[in-house]
């Protein structure tokens, strides 16, 4: 993968220190990233995902991942949750392992990483 869409929970990364660290690592790999554009309530603005993006990295917790899934309904974008909280069931990568996960996504480990493709149920 060559291009990432970064979705940050600013309540868990107020000064964007973690986001900056992850974006810098992506750049070191020679890859591109785009920070999600959000409205005043923190929802991702519709139609703002660049067409060349291949994967969304969701920095937060399970709630952040669920919100991203809802906000990106209709987009064919796999998401990988990077947990910035204490416990995450859906956000499967712990912060300490973000470099390994990005390496795998970039193909350097020559192994596939399972990306979560969740769809919002019509009942929710």
Predicted segments, located by residue:
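N-terminal glycine-/serine-/threonine-rich phosphate-binding loop
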Residues: 1-60, 64-74
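Catalytic core of DAGKc-family lipid kinases
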Residues: 89-124
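Flexible, glycine/proline-enriched loop segments at strand-loop-helix junctions
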Residues: 9-12, 86-92
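Gly/Ser-rich helix-loop-strand patches that form or flank binding pockets
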Residues: 67, 71-89
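Short, charged/polar low-complexity linear motifs in solvent-exposed/disordered segments
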Residues: 32-33, 84, 106-109
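Residue-level signature of transmembrane alpha-helix interfaces in integral membrane proteins
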Residues: 19, 25, 77, 99-104
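Short beta-strand segments
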Residues: 58-60, 81, 121
């Amino acid at each position: 993968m060559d291009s990432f869409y970064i979705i940050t929970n600013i309540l868990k990364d107020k000064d964007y220190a973690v986001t900056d660290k992850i974006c810098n690592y992506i750049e070191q790999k020679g890859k591109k990233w785009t920070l999600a554009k959000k409205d005043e309530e923190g929802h991702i603005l519709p139609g703002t995902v660049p067409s060349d993006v291949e994967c969304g990295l969701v920095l937060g917790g399970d709630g952040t991942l669920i919100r991203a899934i809802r906000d990106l309904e209709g987009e064919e974008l796999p998401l990988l949750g990077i947990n910035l909280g204490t416990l995450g069931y859906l956000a499967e990568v712990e912060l300490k392992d973000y470099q390994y996960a990005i390496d795998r996504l970039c193909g350097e480990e020559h192994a596939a990483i399972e990306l979560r493709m969740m769809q919002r149920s019509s009942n929710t």
